[in-house]
Curated annotation (Swiss-Prot):
NCBIfam families in UniProt: PRK15116.1
Cell location: Membrane
One CC-aspect GO term: membrane
Family label: Belongs to the HesA/MoeB/ThiF family.
Keyword annotations: ATP-binding, Ligase, Membrane, Nucleotide-binding, Transmembrane, Transmembrane helix
Membrane-related topology note: Single-pass membrane protein
Protein name: tRNA threonylcarbamoyladenosine dehydratase
Source organism: Escherichia coli (strain K12)
Phylogenetic placement of the source organism: Bacteria, Pseudomonadati, Pseudomonadota, Gammaproteobacteria, Enterobacterales
Principal place of residence: membrane
Pfam family membership, one: ThiF
The organism's place on the tree of life at top rank: Bacteria
EC number: 6.1.-.-
Length: 268
């Protein structure tokens, strides 16, 4: 059943309709999109979804806001430190659009619970997990069950958002997280390339050579390898910039919306 677009909704998202068209406005209002991982990439993806008029958004994460998230996460404000990221982001979405149906799942996706959390019938899933095994489990499940998904590679260690693009996961470069993810998909879930050398998984990544932090406080550009740092944690690993992490999230949302519109056009 289609969502009835209210006058208030139309006021908020008239600019969306003038850009994408009236049919797309209804498509977005009817959509239910899940963001898994509400951090440096996922928080910005959730923001973009809310401000585009997506009717239902599910946020999955069990992490809390940390003061060290300040450089890259939209919900990392002084008064939010120590609060659950998904809950804080959900309240922000309700402030953006009180009519958005927001669901919070206070948990981390694992190989054991991925089927439970992906059984909702999402219009699209945006994977912003930064740990390899749960990320692989989510991708493998969605791929096997034909749930539309876009994944994101590592967003740390980069300063140039103009080098971000979307390709098949098999084709990424300069991305240790994506490289490790390919290995885990193959070894743990039997996901291998097809005859065209593709995995059939859309991935947001950057062609930029990574900047690695050094123990003496300097930084150094090195060729990315699967053995390099893979995460942006609170104490070590890659540094990060909002300009890059946010763009990863925005590109993921843009790609998902484009795919949704193309599918709707094919179905008439």
């Amino acid at each position: 059943m289609s969502v009835v677009i209210s006058d208030a909704w139309r006021q908020r998202f008239g600019g969306t309709a003038r850009l994408y068209g009236e049919k797309a406005l209804q498509l977005f209002a009817d959509a239910h999109i899940c963001v898994v991982g509400i951090g440096g990439v996922g928080s910005w993806a959730a923001e973009a979804l809310a401000r585009t008029g997506i009717g239902a958004i599910t946020l999955i994460d069990m992490d809390d806001v940390c003061v060290t998230n300040t450089n890259r996460q939209i919900h990392a404000l002084r008064d939010n430190v120590g609060l659950a990221k998904a809950e804080v982001m959900a309240e922000r979405i309700r402030q953006i659009n009180p009519e958005c149906r927001v669901t919070v799942v206070d948990d981390f996706v694992t190989p054991d619970n991925v089927a439970q959390y992906m059984s909702v019938g999402y219009s699209y899933v945006i994977d912003a997990i930064d740990s390899v095994r749960p990320k692989a489990a989510l991708i493998a499940y969605c791929r096997r069950n034909k749930i539309p998904l876009v994944t994101t590679g590592g967003a740390g260690g980069q300063i140039d958002p103009t080098q971000i693009q979307v390709t098949d996961l098999a084709k990424t470069i300069q991305d240790p997280l994506a490289a490790k993810l390919r290995e885990r998909l193959k070894s743990d879930f039997g996901v291998v390339k097809n005859s065209k050398g593709k995995l059939g998984v859309d991935c947001v990544f950057s062609t930029e050579a990574l900047v690695y932090p050094q123990s003496d406080g300097t930084v150094c550009a090195m060729k990315a390898t699967a053995e390099g740092p893979k995460r942006m944690d609170c104490a070590s690993g890659f540094g990060a910039a909002t300009m890059v992490t946010a763009t990863f999230g925005f590109v993921a949302v843009s790609h998902a919306l484009k795919k949704m519109m193309a599918k709707a056009a094919r179905q008439g």
